[in-house]
């Protein structure tokens, strides 16, 4: 099942999403390190900038993801795709709030809680994205298989 958002038969969304997801997970790791660090401000700053980078990257990666989603005809796969997208939209919204709280100087545990919830949502969403590819062949161009 080929996708319209591709370069030389390679889907763009899976190429782009790895970096933002890695940055967002690393942001949570930095927050956790800050809890036990003698220099928590350094780790919180790294967490902030990796979160901002992950947030921007996720928005960019969403563009080819939506293009691919809209091209799916199978209702069952499309439902999985919309669930995948909804979870990602919730996670991105949590990160937007998280970034705003950090800019405003919120020092409570709320940003950490938001990060934990958002990473959990990304895990479930990633599972669904992988299911679409590995179980249903979304983005797999079988016409060029040898």
Language-model-detected regions and their locations in the chain:
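Polytopic transmembrane helical bundles with strong interfacial aromatic enrichment
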Residues: 1-146
């Amino acid at each position: 099942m080929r996708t319209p958002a591709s370069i030389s038969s390679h889907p763009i969304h899976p190429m782009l999403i790895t970096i933002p997801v890695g940055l967002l997970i690393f942001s949570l790791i930095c927050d956790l390190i800050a809890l036990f660090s003698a220099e928590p401000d350094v780790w919180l700053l790294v967490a902030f900038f990796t979160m901002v980078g992950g947030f921007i990257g996720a928005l960019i990666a969403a563009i080819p993801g939506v293009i691919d989603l809209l091209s799916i005809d199978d209702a069952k796969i499309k439902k999985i795709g919309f669930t995948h997208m909804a979870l990602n939209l919730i996670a991105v919204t949590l990160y937007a709030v998280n970034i705003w709280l950090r800019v405003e100087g919120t020092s409570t545990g709320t940003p950490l809680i938001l990060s934990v919830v958002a990473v959990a949502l990304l895990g479930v969403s990633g599972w669904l994205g992988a299911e679409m590819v590995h179980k249903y062949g979304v983005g797999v161009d079988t016409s060029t298989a040898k």
